[in-house]
């Protein structure tokens, strides 16, 4: 198809040259054929055939990202919406059902984080899906600016809430008797966090100029331009100057605070696993020494005669006390291991999810945005939204009080299902959660008494 127009142009150029040479040789041709007309005829013939490139540009505007990129990001974002909403709403429902869970300061701070995760799942993640699937033709500057505002809100609010939970845990571990973070101070801290988050939400709109008349006039004049220029202008990324310091400040405070918490619990990070096998033979020696003590006391008591019961009592009490001490030491070591693992999980999850997008924001501010950095930023944003799934697992489902409440609710649910749907033919199903021993004893004793009564009547 491309060879045919080129051949036609060559033929037309040949005919024009022949015509110009013929008319140029005569006097009439020299007088009546100026060179401007020949140049205009040539240019008109050349420009008639160039009508293909604008169509390709419009096709590129309709598909801003590859289809595989759109499908993968949309799938991950939908999964985060489903898992994040289900887990966070479950946690909030259980917190609201039990009044004793809301009474403490640490639970209120944790609930604030779960409320934020619900808002991110409802507002921020769906808007990211719209931006990924949105064609760039038309004026989409308002949607893009709103998306940047949601990203700014999510990053600042998440970092601030994680920082508040870290300070609360430090206050519990280091100063359990006289706590600094009281209920009134906690409410003031949460209020300041929400105010800071709302201000970070407004910064992209102020930056774009939607609240001023000049900004509105500029948006009306730039309505015909493609909206991909929104993401490639450096002046629209200055709101990242507030997100980057908050992230690094939160990361440093988390590292220092959890190190202090481990020190308060006498947990050494380097020699924690090497100190356990050294103490075990000492425990065995003490146990063996205590086991030899009752033998010697038994020998002395057998020789003593009347003093035997008193010596046996003292030896048994010593053995019981030593067993309790060993059990307490083991529980303490298990508690320390659990705290150490949870601290590592909390720190690593926050850093793994939010470090890539923060580093990329720093690169954008230093070098400038491009199409590649815009796509990479959307991928890192999916990683950052993964905290909506990890927060309930790290801060709620690992707590013992929350686990007890969840188990009790599940028990009541199972009991109601068993009572509402009885089996036919009077078949009794014993539930393992509803004291099976007590029910079995009662039924067994009743049948045994009936058999005895029947046997006694037969004998009589």
Curated annotation (Swiss-Prot):
Disordered as annotated region, ranges: 276-309
Keyword hit for Transmembrane helix: yes
Phenotype seen when the gene is deleted: Morpholino knockdown of the protein leads to defective left-right (LR) axis formation in the embryo. Cilia number and length are reduced in the Kupffer's vesicle (KV). Morpholino knockdown of the protein in Kupffer's vesicle alone is still able to generate the phenotype, indicating that Gpr22 regulates LR asymmetry through the KV.
Main subcellular location of this protein, as a coarse class: membrane
Name of protein: G-protein coupled receptor 22
Stretches with biased composition (Polar residues): 287-305
Keywords: Cell membrane, Cilium biogenesis/degradation, G-protein coupled receptor, Membrane, Receptor, Transducer, Transmembrane, Transmembrane helix
UniProt topological domain (Cytoplasmic) ranges: 1-74, 136-144, 207-235, 365-377
Segments crossing the lipid bilayer: 75-95, 115-135, 145-165, 186-206, 236-256, 344-364, 378-398
Record's function text: Orphan G-protein coupled receptor that regulates cilia length and structure in the Kupffer's vesicle leading to the left-right asymmetry development by establishing a directional fluid flow.
Pfam families cross-referenced by the UniProt entry: 7tm_1
Gene name in the database record: gpr22a
